[in-house]
């Protein structure tokens, strides 16, 4: 694999990946952040250049110092020939199979190569899947070489009803001092490693909230290093009050103004969330969200 660290090549890759949306969105979003300051110190590997078949995004070596930190030890993959991913993944120079890690992608067909590679390394793997939800303007990037999102006005979604703030509630950037609050209410959180990860997401990536009467966030949303919007949550007392809808509208408007790509994943059985985000123009993509969590035998969580 070739390490791609030239800014011109990374920009060319970003534009090229747009042609493979939605399957490439995980990698496309990661390259966006790499091209805009690279706050999570990620690096890009391709099998060849300028023509390529596979792209892998991984943290730089100095980031992966904790063998148990699967929030940091994340590999994001896209392949034009996913059935051929096995040989690449078996290479210990590419994936550190001695660590607990995650492999994320939007191609189910990556799974066979991952399963073969993990079996050869005596690594336990757990597969989880969810629906990938996107908006029309994200899909339009596929047909455009500009790799820019349309403005909020161009999408035609009525946002006036959500724009105005209600008394005692204020839309704001989510402050890193509330990382603990987010961690305590995130299903995948509630531990020290997740707290560290959340702090980085809030500090370095777009995150928004609605402050309640006491000046404390009552609804919030964040973004991960691959431009996936997540951790969205409303405190129980303030649910069904329109606060999360107001946060989402303002947040999405900001992302579009800054030309930041975004998408979300929702469990198929979570019909309430699917209905909720549907009002903002999200719909099911032609592919799904996939994550393979891998544990070396000496680090299995049981």
Curated annotation (Swiss-Prot):
<dbReference type="InterPro" id="IPR010313">
    <property type="entry name" value="Glycine_N-acyltransferase"/>
</dbReference>
<dbReference type="InterPro" id="IPR013652">
    <property type="entry name" value="Glycine_N-acyltransferase_C"/>
</dbReference>
<protein>
    <recommendedName>
        <fullName>Glycine N-acyltransferase-like protein 1</fullName>
        <ecNumber>2.3.1.68</ecNumber>
    </recommendedName>
</protein>
<keyword id="KW-0012">Acyltransferase</keyword>
<comment type="function">
    <text>Acyltransferase which transfers an acyl group to the N-terminus of glutamine. Can use phenylacetyl-CoA as an acyl donor.</text>
</comment>
<dbReference type="GO" id="GO:0006541">
    <property type="term" value="P:glutamine metabolic process"/>
</dbReference>
<comment type="similarity">
    <text>Belongs to the glycine N-acyltransferase family.</text>
</comment>
<dbReference type="GO" id="GO:0047946">
    <property type="term" value="F:glutamine N-acyltransferase activity"/>
</dbReference>
<dbReference type="InterPro" id="IPR015938">
    <property type="entry name" value="Glycine_N-acyltransferase_N"/>
</dbReference>
<dbReference type="Pfam" id="PF06021">
    <property type="entry name" value="Gly_acyl_tr_N"/>
</dbReference>
<dbReference type="GO" id="GO:0005739">
    <property type="term" value="C:mitochondrion"/>
</dbReference>
<dbReference type="GO" id="GO:0047961">
    <property type="term" value="F:glycine N-acyltransferase activity"/>
</dbReference>
<dbReference type="InterPro" id="IPR016181">
    <property type="entry name" value="Acyl_CoA_acyltransferase"/>
</dbReference>
<keyword id="KW-0808">Transferase</keyword>
<dbReference type="Pfam" id="PF08444">
    <property type="entry name" value="Gly_acyl_tr_C"/>
</dbReference>
